[in-house]
Each structure stands twice: as C-alpha cells, then as structure tokens.
Amino acid sequence: MNICFLDNTNFEYNSQDIYSYKLRGAETVLINLSKELSNLGHKITVINNCYKNEIIDDISWKKIQSYDEKETFDLAISNGDTSLFDKINSNKKILFSHSLQTFEKFIRKKQIFSYFKHKPKIVFLSDYHINNTSKITSLFGHIRVNLGIDE
C-alpha cells in the first residue's frame, strides 16, 4: 500500500529527531507509525516541514513547502489539518485528531470547507475525545485507537 503522512508544523523535523526535545506527541506518533508501516512492507512518504527531500530508512521525506507532485496514494493521513489533503490525491483519507475538534476550531483554522471536500475519517485517541468533540466530526466516520488511558 502507498501511504502518505501530511504534517505542517512550524519547525523542521524528520525521523532522525525521534528523541529531540522539540518533538511533541503528534510528531512522535507520526514517526513511529510511519516506521512500523514501512517495516510491514508499505511504501511510505512523509510530506512535512523536514530539512530537505531525502530517503531515511526506506521512507521518503519531502518538504511540504515545495511539494507539488500530486502523486496518488492509497491512504493519506493528516496530522490535525484537513486542508493538507489539497496537496495530494488519495483514495482514502484519515485525519489524526490529537485535540478536541470543535466546530468553532474547524472554522477558526479555516478547515471546514476542506473537511467537507475531502470527507476524511477522524482518528480519536480516547472516548473523551469522541464524547467531547463536535458531532460534525463523525459525519464521514471515525476510528478510535487505544493509545492511552481513558480513566
């Protein structure tokens, strides 16, 4: 499967920064998940604010600022931003939600139109996220993963 990760942090990183102080949980999850999916034989591309276009451990890291390839992926996973799906073509789209996605937040971050355009399933990290986020985020389905403890 050809899988793409999309992230638009305001700092540069790639998988060699896995133990860096600058990484937060979302970036660490992206690195670890991309490595494990690559180990399972999937073709992985990470489009983010990396230092330069390069291949590290069979994973393609591409600078988001200059990415314009419009490659088609089987699956695209965006790290908290639906507008990043505009950069690629994908058969399936998943939005990783690391925080509460309120309707107001979708509007404030100018993601409401891209959410309806791309219709991603949203990955929630806990029942708390599912129960305390806008119901609009479940229009196209959601997935709950057990990365933490609910209680």
Please annotate each region the language model reported.
Residues M1-N48:
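N-terminal subdomain of nucleotide-sugar transferases
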